[in-house]
Amino acid sequence: VPLTFFPKKVPGLQQAFRLKDGAWRMNLTVEALGQSVQADVFHLYSLKAGAAYGSVLMNFFVVGAPANEWRISVPAGIGNIDVSGQNVGRDWRREGDVVVVPLSRPVLGAGTILLTFEQPMCARGGDISPGEVRPLGVQGERGYVQVVSPLQVNYDISRSEGALLKLDPSELPAEFRLLSSAPTLAA
């Protein structure tokens, strides 16, 4: 029986069966599934004189077993880090190239955090590698990268690897385009 047709709502109901007569029997094999975490990530980089300012919004979806912490890869050249979000206190820490974010309550289902940072750059320009701030220990990651600047700058995408697709700025979802009023350089 489809769960939507079950006459009484029961929290946590996963299977329902209908009996056609009194002589019935069933064997059920049950297997506990491990934790699976999917991440939707939006990287926003704003280029200004002497620095690139980054905001990385991470939406996690956890099934199987609750998550007690988030682990995020952050390159060494990135500083002035701040982390905020659901169930996130001030006790996050940096361990080398990893930011460890303990959660005040374990998360099962959806969880969101925002990691902001600065990456120093020469006032005349320099190199940045958007997308290097990434969630660790996830089974799947997808998302968007947007680079904006209120300044007039020349830029060149010197290298693009993997499953990264260049987008026209109008192809970014509207909810992400609204996060910056500066012109988009690359998406």
Where are the regions that the model predicts?
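Extended non-catalytic domains of envelope/secretory-pathway proteins
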Residues: V1-A187
